[in-house]
Amino acid sequence: MRNLFIRESGLRILLLIFSLSYLLSAQAQPRQLLVPGGVAIINLEPGNDSGYRFLDKPVLVTKIEGKPAALVGLPLSLKAGEHFIEKSSADQVFKKFFEIKQKQYSTQHITITDKRKVNPYASDMERILAEKARKQKARNHYSMVDVDVDFLRPVEGISTGSFGRRRVFNGQKRRPHSGMDIAADKGTPVLAPSAGTVIETGDFFFSGNLVYIDHGQGLISLFAHLSEIDVNLGEQVEKGQTIGKVGATGRVTGPHLHWSLGLNGNWIDPALFLPVTD
């Protein structure tokens, strides 16, 4: 009888471990959201899973539940309706279709005390345009390496600015919010959510101290408004490594981390790469 109890108890423990492992692995996968600014997850056939493109840019291919799948970043400007990824091979063209629904993002009104950060001087424009080109290059960077899509939250804190919101600074309309804002004390360590390579750093007019990390296959993180930068250009960083500290540099209302996540050249909602509890 005692042996039966031990066997049953052991079975329950194994089942509990399996259930927890499955739950954690399920939470770790990116989540699909078929709206502008979201992510499409498209199943692919083994052996025919490379070379797919969306809007003429290569898409990230990884394993979802052990099977190949494409992760496709959907631009905020994308129209509702049918879209597809495609690849050409010899005389064949392969297409995978998916349907996008429209989403109405809310509007956020923000007061910036440093008016120069809303209406820059003419003397600022050369710097701003040069930095814009550097940002564009970093966002479109592509390296063909395996990607760990099991992301960590880069900093603990309260999310204060939602991705995709239409922003109005001092009564003037600006581009939609391209990332997630997380409020935290100045000096709080900012962690790399996944391994990658530092492809851009510097003190930028609007973004303040920033770091770009290439996670591979067009998956790019941007961390802005840092008080300190703790990594160097070209450095290989590990998941969980401190890359900088929370700050209030650039165009801000207070200390926080701005985290943008780019996929095949499009800014997407970073929350889709975090566990559902976040």
Report residues per predicted region:
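Bacterial N-terminal signal peptides that target proteins for export
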Residues: 2-14
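Bacterial N-terminal signal peptides
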Residues: 12-22
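Cationic-aromatic interfacial patches
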Residues: 27-104
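Terminal peptide-recognition signature
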Residues: 56, 85, 159, 182, ...
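Surface-exposed, glycine-biased beta-strand/turn segments
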Residues: 97-207
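Short, well-structured beta-strand-loop connectors
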Residues: 189-199, 228-246
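Zn2+-dependent peptidoglycan hydrolase active-site motif and core
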Residues: 193-227, 255, 260
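Extended, charge-rich intrinsically disordered regulatory tails
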Residues: 237, 241-248, 253, 259-278
